[in-house]
Structure formats: C-alpha cells, structure tokens
C-alpha cells in the first residue's frame, strides 16, 4: 500500500483543518451545507473546531435542507441541529415545499437545495456557501461528465471555489477522500445519517459509485480521476485565456471597420479572421456570443459543435473563393440567429417564434 493510500484512512488533524479553512479566515459569515450525512457532518465538526481555535474569524451558520423525500429527513435535520448546538453554531432547517416532479428528482432536488442555501446565505450576509464535496464525489462527477460527452470545461468537474446564484460556493474538502472524513467522525465519536438514496441503482451516481472498486482495480481510482479533473481545469483556464485574447482581436477588427453592432442588436465577427482561429477557440467564441445575445441559453455543446461545423463549411466557400453552400448561412440556436454573408458573421437575437395558425 502506498503512503497516499494509507493516509486516506487517517483522521484529519487540527493542522490540516487550519490549512483547509485558512482561505475563509477574513470572512464575516460562512454558511455550511449540512445534510446529516457523514461528509457534511465532518465538515461542520472540522469547521467548528477550526473556528474555536481562533480569536476572531467568521460566524458559522449550519443549514440543513429537508427535501421531504424520505420519512427520516426530519429526524436527520434534528440530529444536525443538536450537534450544531453542541458545537456552538447557529442552525437553520429549510424545507423544499411544493409539488415534486415525477421524474428527474435528483436534479430537481439539487436545484432546490442550492436555491434555498443561496437564500439563507444572502439573508445571513455570508460570503460563501461551504459544501462537503470530496475527492470521491469529484471522481463520480468526472465519470458522469465523460458519459455525457462533456468537453474540457465539463471534465474539469467541480472547482474548489465557483460562483452560483450570485454567491461563492466553496468546497474545501475536495482534495480529501471520503474515508478520511469517516475516520475523522469515528475518532470524534460523531454519529451521522445513512441515506439509502445514495445506494439506489435507479439513479446514475449510485450506479457509478458501485462501479468504483472495479474501475479502481483498473487504475481509474478516485485519486486518478480527480487528477484528470485538475488537469482539465488547467487546460480549460489556458484555453479561456486564449479565447479572451481572440475575442479582443476580433472586436478590434470590427471596430476598425466601424461595423460592429452593439447592445441588443448583436455581435459581429470578421469571417476570415474567425476562420483562422483554432477550432476550440472558434467554438468558444461562438458559444459566448450566442449566450450573450440569445434568450434560450446556455447553448448546448453538441448543438454548438454542429453549428460550427456548418459554419466552417460555409466559411470555406468564402475564404477559398468557392461557392460552398453559396457562401451564406442563417440558423437559429438558443434564441440567437447566426448568419453569415461575405462580409460578416453576425449573431443577433432570433425573431419571435410564430404561433401555429398565425
């Protein structure tokens, strides 16, 4: 067993907790997302222990979202409240009320959960919503993105800090294994809830979770998959930087021609300059423009790729002096109209759809 593997079963030390939460030392309030499961209970305990060692620091608000999907959920929320009280933390339970969808429950519950967490954080004046995502969660997310055919940005999976619903979402435990969180709870004598939904084969994530031991035996263990996500994130950041530069370059060209349309009218690219860019940069610039101008975004990657292929074929007819597809294109996507004539690629708001019978 390697050193890294043996460390995966050790409790998290006070020194490690200090490093994990150090980026939040100057925050006024932190909202901790605590469901009652082992990961989030470990998060709350670690955050409280870290806060207790500091003369100053953020106030910690533990928030439990009761989705009302299982009869045990109220009892689990009460368990979180009791531990939070023992740790000297403020606790709130928020309930997902209203009718639940017949299908797509995990995604609907996730959206509702983050909406409620964001609202609680905003009311408390919190700088971050802190979640207990682990390296194991990251590995599962990478696999899910692979199965969906995600691009580089998707394979980067979860970032340590990201923005959602106007707030910063922080994942300080993303580099740690779930086994270490369990070891921490055992060492501290802290109980936690066991949600059977996490093992329900009716849902994609639990099915992939059940496959992890087999994948690990072939070398695709959580550490390796998380490393893949980190490398994809680095590559994505580099490509985004290049796309920013290309976008500025095209804007300067358009300004020089005094023909760039602004505001609600849309955007314009010089066809030859656009065609000279690498394919991934062209794709990102196209998606950015569609998302800015369109009304039905964000645009789907696969549909944007198909549009770019058609645009490239049409551009070939212009840049090579030929007549491929007669050198013109007009297509709507995600509420935007993408058109190409000899002088410009234009992305503008799509006209309203006609109702049947009109």
Curated annotation (Swiss-Prot):
Enzyme class at the top of the EC tree: ligase
Keyword terms of this UniProt record: ATP-binding, Cytoplasm, Ligase, Nucleotide-binding, tRNA processing
Protein name per its UniProtKB record: tRNA(Ile)-lysidine synthase
Source taxon at top rank: Bacteria
A GO molecular function held by the record: tRNA(Ile)-lysidine synthase activity
GO biological process, one term: tRNA modification
PANTHER family named among the record's database cross-references: TRNA(ILE)-LYSIDINE SYNTHASE-RELATED
NCBIfam families: lysidine_TilS_N (TIGR02432)
Positions that bind ATP: 35-40
Function: Ligates lysine onto the cytidine present at position 34 of the AUA codon-specific tRNA(Ile) that contains the anticodon CAU, in an ATP-dependent manner. Cytidine is converted to lysidine, thus changing the amino acid specificity of the tRNA from methionine to isoleucine.
Transmembrane domains' residue ranges: none
InterPro entries recorded: Rossmann-like_a/b/a_fold, TilS/TtcA_N, tRNA_Ile_lys_synt, tRNA_Ile_lys_synt_N
Entry domain remark: The N-terminal region contains the highly conserved SGGXDS motif, predicted to be a P-loop motif involved in ATP binding.
Pfam families recorded: ATP_bind_3
Family: Belongs to the tRNA(Ile)-lysidine synthase family.
Record carries keyword tRNA processing: yes
Subcellular location: Cytoplasm
Catalytic activity: cytidine(34) in tRNA(Ile2) + L-lysine + ATP = lysidine(34) in tRNA(Ile2) + AMP + diphosphate + H(+)
EC number of this enzyme: 6.3.4.19
UniProt organism field: Bradyrhizobium sp. (strain BTAi1 / ATCC BAA-1182)
One cellular component term from this protein's GO annotations in UniProt: cytoplasm
Chief localization: cytoplasm
